[in-house]
Structures are given as structure tokens and as C-alpha cells.
């Protein structure tokens, strides 16, 4: 081989190496699940929460949003993961190092479970019995659920998770309400705020700077009842590290798109992960395909609520100003309709407008009475009023309203009904396609920054390796232009194998002298 040919070969190899760097032959790592009942693989990482939410809401697969704190990153900096419950658990239980600081994103407007975040500083509260406080709180909340909603529950319906350390008592409580769930976590927050108002009032008296509301004094039996509850809820008052009094219950975990730490996860820089508490009485339903540990994990997820026609609980307080103070007055539904909620627009304004076109026609001005968003299944359920056309009976119902269900994943809508006979039949109309301008896939726009993170085969989360700016701006060479992702041609593979076998048979070696000469010429 001459020196010129050697230089040509070196140049060819360098060109191929550059081409492979900019267009790798291997695809990015995609996790795979082996069981037939498990969903197809979706594992996407985003640097921004809104990008993750947009992606999750715009694809058909059954996915959910989680946030991750990465070792070595700045405090408060999080990466957002979009995947299915099954896939997260599969890698969550095997790649503990990269997924050990994981949080569920409780989406704004999503139907959810009743939940609590409880904690106190042990050194400042040496006389307190945390287990007793948890038991008394569960009993009190169960009493209020029966009083307000007529729901019967007990400690057996409450998953109790513990991440306490020698310094801090820390528990999460997740209520599995029988055939019921809350409209979203803002309604959960209002319900908890109101039932704990006696404790807040008591705290306000001893600590004027403590958070709470001022209410007008109520005369008669109601005032006495409030006074009794203030005394009964005295166990909820704890002291922080500075000795200041505060509530045992964290009232700040009911904000929109709240990140709530997962079962078996710890905070960044900490080692105390949530485990099942010693006093936990909740036992998940058995399943042949799912282990007990995974069933606990699924039960712990706040928005893991499927649309089954269960009661959707709301809790609204109308603000009234009296002598400069706010007087929240409870407004709750007196009936047990399956579809309760706010009359404001849903998180999907375009879908709301489309549904209105379905019920405002033929001279009838229908309207959306209520809506509920089931994030677990990507379903928007609209309770319609004034428009009663039913596809089942092919006419307008005389007194019963209809339900419009929009499936954001499948990009279809269908009709259900409040009519007793239609409900007995469990009637559901045929599915009708959503207009393209309403479909989430049509609205999805991704940018390069959304591809900033990848997961390797060991579960490590790293920044994606991007090609240099020069390679992205240059025109593809004639040799590589038109390369695609299709499989290699079988005839090409056979020919390549024959050439390689011929080269092995010839067993020709380049003399050392010629190699040294080529190297010297290159230098």
C-alpha cells in the first residue's frame, strides 16, 4: 500500500467517524418491559415542567409526570420524567441511585386522593407521641368525612408512610376513600383548611404571626362546638426548631402542580426514604401480576384515580367581608351526583370550546355545568345542562342531562347519560373523532432543549451529547445524504460478509516499513 492510499484511507476513516458522531447508528436508550400486560415504552426527560406536562397531555400512551432531584445538582433543580406507572416502578426498583429522589407531580385540576404531609422537630417536642397524633388525626378526619360527605372510612383506608429520622418526625397519609375522590388538590386543601380551622384559631391566639383566618364569633351551640374542637385539636400544635408554635399538618402541599415525594424516595442530600409505617393498617388489594410492594407504590400515588363513576367531592368557600375580616362560608353539594366540580374553564380551553359547539345547536343553548379531569386516564368529563339529546334513545330526555367524555389520549369523544335506564345499561355512545385543531398531538411542539437529558442502560441520567454547531450547519456529503433509519438490505449484508471473508483468506499484512513511511509523511 502506497503512502497516498494510506492517507486516503485515514481520511475516509476520519470522515466516517465524524459522520457516526453526528448521526449515531445506535438509537438512544429506550427501556423495555418484558411482561405482556405492561405498556409500551415511554421514557422522556425534560428540563422544564411545562414541557413535560405538554408532552404527557399530547400523546396517546398512558403516561404520568414525575420530577427527579439529581445527585450533584443544585438544590431545588429538578428534571421532569414522563413515563408509565409500570415502567417507572420497573426502573425505580432497580436503579435506586439515579431515581432515589423522585416526586409525583400532582397536576392542576386533576382528580386526586385526600392526602396529608405531617412533620415536627423531635428535639423541640420531646413530650409528643407522633404515633398517637397520627392515629387521632386519622380518627378526626374520618369523622369529618362522614359529617360532610356521608363517607364511612377508618384507619384501614389510610396508607401511612414514614420517613422519620432521629431529628424529625415525618409521615405521609393517603386516604383511599370508598368509591369517592376529590375534584383536585385545591378542594382537598380547602376541606383540610376548614376542618382544621379550630386548631388554626387556637394557634392564632398563642402566636399572632401564625397563619390562619379570622372568623366572626358565632353565637349559640356552634360557638360552643368550635370551642370544644379547639381544645380537642390541641394535639396538632407543635414547635419548630426556633421554639415557635405551628401546625403538625403542612397546609402548603395543596398548590397547583405540586411535587409530592414518592414511596421509597428520600430528599436530595438525605437518606430517609418513605417506608410503610409500623402502625399502618392499610392493606392493598391482592393481585397475581403485581407484587405487594408495587401495589403499595400504586396506592401511594395521589392522582392514580381512574374514572369509574365514583363520587367527585368538592369543597368551596365563598369569601365574604365582614368588618374587615374574611368569613369563609362552606358551600357543598347536597346531592350525591357523580359529576361535581367548578364552573370555571378546564385546563384545556380549546376542548371546552369544542364541547360547547356540540351542545349549542338546533336553537338550544346548552352549557357546561361541571367538569372533572382524570389525569390518570387523560379523560375530561363534562356534565352538560340544557341539552339532553341522547344517542341511546335517539331523542331528548325530558328531565335527565347528558355527559360528554373527551378522551385526550385517543383523541375521541363520546356521550354518557344521567338517565337511570341509560345508567342501568351502562350506556356509552360510539366514539367520535376530535377536530384536528383540538387534538393534543396537533398542538405539541418540541424544541431542542426538551431533548437535553437521556438515560443510559445503567439508569444514569446525563445531559444528551449534541453534535457540534458546525456539523449541524454544514451540508450533508454526497456519501451520506439520504441515509435513513430503515434496516440494512439483506443482499448488502451478504456481499459485505463475502468481502470480509475474502480479505481474511488473503491474510495480507502491510509491511512495517511502509507503515512507518506513511506515518512520517503524514507528520
UniProtKB/Swiss-Prot annotation:
Residues holding Zn(2+): 390, 397, 417, 422
EC number per UniProt: 2.7.7.102, 2.7.7.7
Cofactors named for this entry: Mn(2+)
GO biological processes: error-prone translesion synthesis; mitochondrial DNA repair; mitochondrial DNA replication; R-loop processing; replication fork processing; response to UV; translesion synthesis
Reaction(s) the record says it catalyses: ssDNA + n NTP = ssDNA/pppN(pN)n-1 hybrid + (n-1) diphosphate; DNA(n) + a 2'-deoxyribonucleoside 5'-triphosphate = DNA(n+1) + diphosphate
GO cellular component: DNA-directed RNA polymerase complex; mitochondrial matrix; nucleus; replication fork
Keywords: Chromosome, DNA damage, DNA repair, DNA-directed DNA polymerase, DNA-directed RNA polymerase, Manganese, Metal-binding, Mitochondrion, Nucleotidyltransferase, Nucleus, Transcription, Transferase, Zinc
Free-text function comment from the UniProt entry: DNA primase and DNA polymerase required to tolerate replication-stalling lesions by bypassing them. Required to facilitate mitochondrial and nuclear replication fork progression by initiating de novo DNA synthesis using dNTPs and acting as an error-prone DNA polymerase able to bypass certain DNA lesions. Shows a high capacity to tolerate DNA damage lesions such as 8oxoG and abasic sites in DNA.
The protein's name: DNA-directed primase/polymerase protein
